[in-house]
Amino acid sequence: MAIERTFSMIKPDATRRNLTGAIIAKLEEAGLRVVASKRVWMSRREAEGFYAVHKDRPFFGELVEFMSSGPTVVQVLEGENAIAKNREVMGATNPANADEGTIRKTFALSIGENSVHGSDAPETAAEEIAYWFSGTEIVG
């Protein structure tokens, strides 16, 4: 098994409801370790940059508006197969399709306000981590 790092974000719908600790607890219970974390309130420009891959999708404007509507917690997680493990713990994007006990099934309000974001591949993990963190901010 490979020790790897992944990017994780707790979205504004969850921070507004004070769910940060409960979400981090679920991640840690799954064997993931937080090696970098900070609370940020994204500007529209930061949200547009972070989600640039979706710029041509019909939901892009709504996504940018939501992500810049309140604080988020951006994190780097580390553990065995961290990318797959984080995605498993998060659950399906649509909370209606998420397995019981997952973060999204437990906490998400809707497909748009689904509480968390996580990288889907090693390449996106590296890009997303670099978007928010310098190397000196990641402390294993």
Swiss-Prot record:
One of its GO terms (cellular component) is cytoplasm. The keyword Secreted does not apply. InterPro entries: NDK-like_dom (IPR034907), NDK-like_dom_sf (IPR036850), Nucleoside_diP_kinase (IPR001564), Nucleoside_diP_kinase_AS (IPR023005). It comes from the Bacteria. Its cofactor is Mg(2+). It is an enzyme of class 2 (transferase). The active site is at H117 (pros-phosphohistidine intermediate). PANTHER family: NUCLEOSIDE DIPHOSPHATE KINASE (PTHR11349). Homotetramer. This is Nucleoside diphosphate kinase. The gene is ndk.
